[in-house]
A protein has these predicted regions:
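Membrane-proximal loop-to-helix boundary features in eukaryotic membrane proteins
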Residues: 1-13, 19-57, 71-160
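Eukaryotic helix-linker segments that join adjacent hydrophobic helices
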Residues: 57, 62-65
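Short amphipathic alpha-helical segments
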Residues: 68
């Protein structure tokens, strides 16, 4: 029963991150459909409400997948010193590395999604520096996040 639950959790995390990635890429495509005027590195364009909604959905799913993997992965990675890290079994070291990578990918991916989504929040046209590909890069990082979350969950819940 535990193995079936673990498989379900892994599939849930992967599905949420895949949907988040697809929503991020779709948001980028919707953003590219609006009118824009570009002059060198400056750009004026209308915000896209569909891109805003898709970006918000992608960010929410990314955070939810991260929370689920961290809560269900457990908290057995408490390593307080370099000496403890060196004495820890390889499985625990790998688990800690995956945990660190999931947090880094979450920080970068969520930042990209929020910046890309925020540029579509305003009600009128805005001008400024170009914000190209933030949503699609955030979407791609959602896929990578799914891989590391599953690796973390598997290594954190497996026996040493």
């Amino acid at each position: 029963m535990v193995k079936i639950g673990g498989v379900f959790v892994c599939l849930l995390i992967v599905a949420m991150d895949i949907v988040a990635g697809i929503l991020g890429i779709e948001a980028e495509l919707e953003q590219n459909k609006v009118k824009q005027l570009r002059l060198w590195i400056f750009e004026c364009r209308e915000p896209s409400h569909p891109a805003f909604k898709l970006g918000m959905g992608a960010a929410a799913l990314l955070v939810l997948a991260h929370v689920i993997s961290n809560l269900l992965g457990g908290c057995n990675n408490c390593i307080c010193s370099q000496d403890e890290l060196q004495k820890a079994p390889p499985n625990r070291q790998l688990s800690l590395a995956c945990l660190v990578f999931t947090w880094v990918i979450l920080a970068v991916g969520l930042s990209m999604l929020v910046i890309g989504t925020w540029s579509n929040h305003k009600s009128g046209a805005s001008c400024g520096f170009t914000h190209h590909h933030f949503l699609s890069i955030g979407g791609i990082l959602c896929f990578v996040h799914g891989l590391f979350c599953v690796a973390y969950y598997i290594t954190a819940t497996s026996t040493d």
